[in-house]
């Protein structure tokens, strides 16, 4: 990892100006707009009605579309699988204005081209496969998939299609057949391509918690210990915070990526890398307030970097923090600033390092009461008590907040030197070591990201086969509903079972 504290090169400045792709920009806009509402989300999938973009009486439109496009598919399934389901639609609802009817028919060729992408057809294909599986284990795959697909945030799904699918799932209920799901959890849950492809795009819970904390109106400062797995959006979280941010990182590429994202959103930023004093801070054009334009081209070619009124985020390396802090203090009230320190433990695993003195100086001379310490491996509060005490002595009214997340969508298993998956129940020889491991893991759940879901499912099934579990810890009692069984809930369940093991 490149930890050199140097100014940006010309090529690095040019890199910042390359726009992110449309998909990434949409996610960045979601984070930015979460400043006002952390519950916003979107889904790229479209229902039939959303695709044709027609307004009017929804009941009439649903009835007409069902009768014209979905009825035959549904009736074929009813006949083939002998289903006792009847869908009655009043004839008056099926009649559509001739102009609207013609408009829809004119879209038939387009509908045919993207039919497999329309949400109702995705649901109907899944329910057909569910029925086709009969008593096979794979039936559970489609049941679990449909339960989650129906929860997605898709506007105006045809209500008759929804009714048909829900009736089947209710009458063919396999809700309590947890064993089949857990046995195949790798394929049915973690690597479920349908759920991955059609899921909602929304904030992680730890981001919601962070934004609620930092965007609330309050007079006192706050130190937030922000611990969440790698790859879950921590380094983009500054975009969702209303306060003016001083983002500090040891690794230049992390800062560059955040800067590029900010520029794509047209957020006014400044860059402080390799600074020897405040005059080395550079403004991006979006942040420039006083500048000179080229008379012929009209482009900005000289910026007064000493005027930083417009800067919302300043991105700094470790050695430039104090310069960045003083620069931002010149234009903002202290309580309107936030020091966002990315990976504060970097280099601390060395006995000595050139950064240690700089880190100590930054902490000692810091004047900003709002601080976020962000890392996947951030020590727990009790392990950094002297640091907490120092913060409280400097900011007596400051609050301490822990945001600890272990949510993750992908497992990155740990493989031992022999090529086998490493898990607590596989690598420890003594009961005492397993118990010590569980105790540590309960306080450091971000490590769960490295626990293989396949080995977890084998362990869970083994525990049930040996019948030594108390009733309340058996899967049917532990999980209230089948949709509660997720990658992360299985990993927590695994820890629970490990903690309940008896020595004999």
Regions found by a protein language model. Give the residues of each.
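N-terminal helicase ATP-binding lobe
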Residues: 1-504
């Amino acid at each position: 990892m490149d930890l050199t504290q140097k100014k940006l090169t010309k090529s690095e400045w040019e890199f910042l100006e390359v726009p992110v792709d449309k998909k990434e920009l949409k996610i960045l806009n979601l984070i930015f707009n979460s400043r006002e509402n952390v519950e916003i989300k979107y889904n790229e999938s479209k229902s039939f009605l959303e695709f044709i973009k027609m307004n009017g009486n929804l009941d009439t439109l649903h009835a007409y579309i069902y009768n014209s496009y979905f009825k035959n598919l549904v009736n074929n399934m009813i006949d083939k699988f002998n289903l006792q389901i009847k869908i009655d639609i009043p004839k008056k609802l099926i009649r559509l204005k001739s102009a609207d009817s013609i408009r829809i028919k004119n879209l038939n060729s387009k509908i045919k081209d993207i039919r497999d992408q329309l949400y109702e057809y995705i649901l109907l294909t899944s329910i057909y496969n569910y029925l086709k599986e009969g008593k096979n284990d794979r039936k559970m795959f489609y049941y679990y998939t449909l339960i989650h697909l129906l929860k997605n945030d898709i506007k105006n799904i045809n209500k008759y299609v929804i009714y048909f699918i829900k009736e089947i799932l209710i009458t063919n209920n396999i809700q309590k057949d947890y064993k089949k799901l857990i046995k195949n959890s790798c394929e049915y849950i973690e690597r479920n391509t349908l759920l991955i492809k059609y899921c909602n795009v929304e904030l992680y819970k730890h981001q919601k918690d962070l934004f609620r904390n930092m965007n609330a109106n309050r007079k006192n400062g706050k130190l937030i210990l922000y611990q969440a797995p790698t790859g879950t959006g921590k380094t983009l979280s500054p975009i969702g915070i209303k306060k003016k941010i001083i983002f500090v990182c040891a690794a230049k590429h992390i800062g560059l990526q955040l800067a590029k994202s900010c520029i794509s959103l047209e957020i006014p930023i400044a860059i402080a890398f390799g600074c020897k004093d405040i005059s080395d801070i550079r403004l991006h054009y979006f942040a420039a307030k006083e500048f000179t334009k080229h008379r012929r081209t009209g482009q900005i070619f000289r910026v007064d970097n000493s005027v930083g009124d417009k800067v919302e985020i300043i991105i700094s390396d470790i050695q430039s923090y104090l310069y960045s802090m003083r620069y931002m203090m010149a234009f903002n009230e202290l309580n309107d600033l936030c020091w966002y320190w990315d990976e504060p433990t970097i280099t601390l695993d060395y006995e000595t390092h050139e950064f240690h003195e700089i880190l100590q100086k930054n902490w000692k001379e810091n004047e900003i009461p709002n601080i976020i310490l962000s890392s996947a491996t951030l020590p727990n509060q009790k392990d950094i008590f002297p640091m907490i005490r120092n913060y409280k002595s400097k900011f007596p009214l400051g609050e301490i907040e822990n945001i600890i997340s272990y949510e993750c969508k992908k497992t990155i298993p740990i493989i031992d030197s022999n090529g086998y998956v490493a898990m607590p129940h596989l690598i420890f020889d003594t009961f005492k070591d397993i118990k010590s491991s569980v105790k540590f893991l309960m306080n450091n759940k971000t490590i769960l990201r490295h626990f293989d879901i396949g080995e977890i499912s084998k362990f869970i099934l083994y525990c049930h086969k040996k019948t030594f579990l108390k009733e309340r810890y058996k899967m049917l009692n532990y999980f209230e509903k089948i949709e509660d069984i997720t990658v992360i809930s299985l990993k927590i369940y695994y820890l629970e079972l490990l903690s309940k093991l008896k020595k004999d």
